[in-house]
């Protein structure tokens, strides 16, 4: 990736360092010493959280647009910044803010990629690596914050506001402050360029308010052009009825559960049956692979190669279909080792304990009592039904042969699916 152009230097004849007998303007006093720049400042404006729901992005989304980055570099984390203010009635909590940092930079520079930590949300693009980023962090005395922009089709979490957008006074004051910072950085020239760590996400230029206002549009256009040239579309696919039907027609073990095609629709109800899964709480059943915890869950799943190479398989003939062809079931078992040295070890145990057999704690729907034609509630007690003539029971309808769910009662219990590998 090309290095961004250096900032343009603006100098004046009366403040050139090479001129002799240089005199200062104004009050004639020496400037106040400035502290060292904060090396944990994000390149982008933050997200303000106005609700209780935590920050979460679907897989492959959540990385701000960067005109100078490649797909492999688009990975990092959002870090929550809790705020509070002292009032006359005590301490008042303010709305939290979230800031984005590239992998290996910022306050959590030493945190391994996708490690679990409170207040940290990892995001990455498809094809991104876990290598430390070359973009570093921002020097606020030199560079103004970039208004955070996302790829088209990105689902912004509900009750989150992108700072620097909209017409409120907060964003207006921030924009004017950015303009002043940019003007100061331009007048300082090359002396301030060494304060920013790493490579900038954007090409530098004269820090005017017009250039800052046009920057988000420029980033969006450059990203769309790159997507068109590579033949990729970043917009998430909208699940239609036709798509849902096609997903349902896939083989059961090849389906993928999402929010639009949840776990129950894809794989059936959770339960103890031989063809039922016993993993998943209410949130996982609802969101599937779009659950914010999915990256940690997926680390427990074996790859296709590991599954075929580590499992004990058994082929069982169950029955025949309508044409007389035999129906077989492939059962498998195995185990994996959870390494205590892994940084996600405690998170794995927490996920397993909260999701294994979680269906046993699901609330049961109460059946409403049936009412008669005159509006009276029918009672099921034997004393009230003595005078009612017993109706002959109907013969149960014949079931269609070949249905997996209808034959589950006759199947032998399958062993739990676990896998054995040395981490």
Curated annotation (Swiss-Prot):
* GO CC, alphabetical: host cell endoplasmic reticulum-Golgi intermediate compartment; host cell Golgi apparatus; ribonucleoprotein complex; viral nucleocapsid
Q: Which domain of life is it from?
A: Viruses
Among the GO molecular function terms of this UniProt record, one is: RNA binding
Q: Which residues form the CoV N CTD domain?
A: 240-363
Q: Which residue ranges does the record annotate as region Dimerization?
A: 251-360
| Segments of this protein annotated with the region RNA-binding | 33-175
Instruction: Indicate where the modification Phosphoserine is found in the sequence.
Output: 133
Which residues belong to any copy of the CoV N NTD domain?
A: 39-164
Q: Which family does it belong to?
A: Belongs to the betacoronavirus nucleocapsid protein family.
Q: What does this protein do?
A: Packages the positive strand viral genome RNA into a helical ribonucleocapsid (RNP) and plays a fundamental role during virion assembly through its interactions with the viral genome and membrane protein M. Plays an important role in enhancing the efficiency of subgenomic viral RNA transcription as well as viral replication.
Q: What is this protein called?
A: Nucleoprotein
Q: Which organism is it from?
A: Bat coronavirus HKU4
């Amino acid at each position: 990736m090309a290095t961004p152009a250096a900032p343009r230097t603006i100098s004046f004849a009366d403040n050139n360092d090479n001129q002799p007998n240089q005199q200062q303007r104004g009050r004639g006093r020496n400037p106040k010493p400035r502290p060292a720049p904060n090396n944990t400042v994000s390149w982008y404006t933050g997200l303000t959280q106005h609700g209780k729901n935590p920050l979460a992005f679907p897989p492959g989304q959540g990385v701000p647009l960067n005109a100078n980055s490649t797909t492999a570099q688009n990975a990092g984390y959002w870090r929550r910044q809790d705020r509070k203010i002292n009032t006359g009635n005590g301490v008042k909590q303010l709305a939290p803010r979230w800031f984005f940092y590239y992998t290996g930079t910022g306050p959590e520079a030493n945190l391994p990629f996708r490690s679990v930590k409170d207040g940290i949300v990892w995001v990455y693009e498809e094809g991104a690596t876990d290598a430390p980023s070359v973009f570093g962090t921002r020097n606020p005395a030199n560079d103004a914050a970039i208004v955070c922009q996302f790829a088209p089709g990105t689902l912004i979490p509900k009750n989150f506001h992108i700072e620097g957008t909209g017409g409120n006074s907060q964003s207006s004051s921030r924009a004017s402050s950015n303009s002043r910072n940019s003007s100061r950085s331009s007048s300082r020239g090359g002396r301030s360029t060494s304060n920013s760590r790493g490579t900038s996400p954007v090409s530098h230029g004269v820090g005017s308010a017009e250039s800052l206002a046009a920057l988000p549009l420029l980033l969006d256009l450059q990203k769309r052009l790159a997507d068109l040239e590579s033949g990729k579309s970043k917009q998430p696919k909208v699940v239609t009825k036709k798509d849902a039907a096609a997903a349902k027609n896939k083989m059961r073990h090849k389906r993928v559960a999402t929010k639009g095609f949840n776990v129950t629709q894809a794989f059936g109800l959770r339960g103890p049956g031989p063809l039922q899964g016993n993993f998943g709480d209410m949130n996982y059943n609802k969101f599937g692979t779009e659950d914010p915890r999915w990256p940690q869950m997926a680390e427990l799943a074996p790859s296709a190669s590991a599954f075929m190479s580590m499992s004990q398989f058994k082929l069982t003939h169950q029955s025949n279909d309508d044409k007389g062809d035999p129906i077989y079931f492939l059962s498998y078992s195995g185990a994996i080792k959870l390494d205590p040295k892994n940084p996600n070890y405690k998170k794995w145990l927490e996920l397993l304990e909260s999701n294994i057999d979680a269906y046993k704690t699901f609330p049961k729907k109460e059946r409403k009592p049936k009412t008669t034609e005159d509006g009276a509630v029918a009672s099921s007690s034997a004393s009230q039904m003595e005078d009612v003539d017993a109706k002959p029971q109907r013969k149960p309808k014949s079931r269609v042969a070949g249905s997996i769910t209808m034959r589950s009662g006759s199947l032998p219990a399958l062993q739990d699916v676990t896998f054995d590998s040395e981490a």
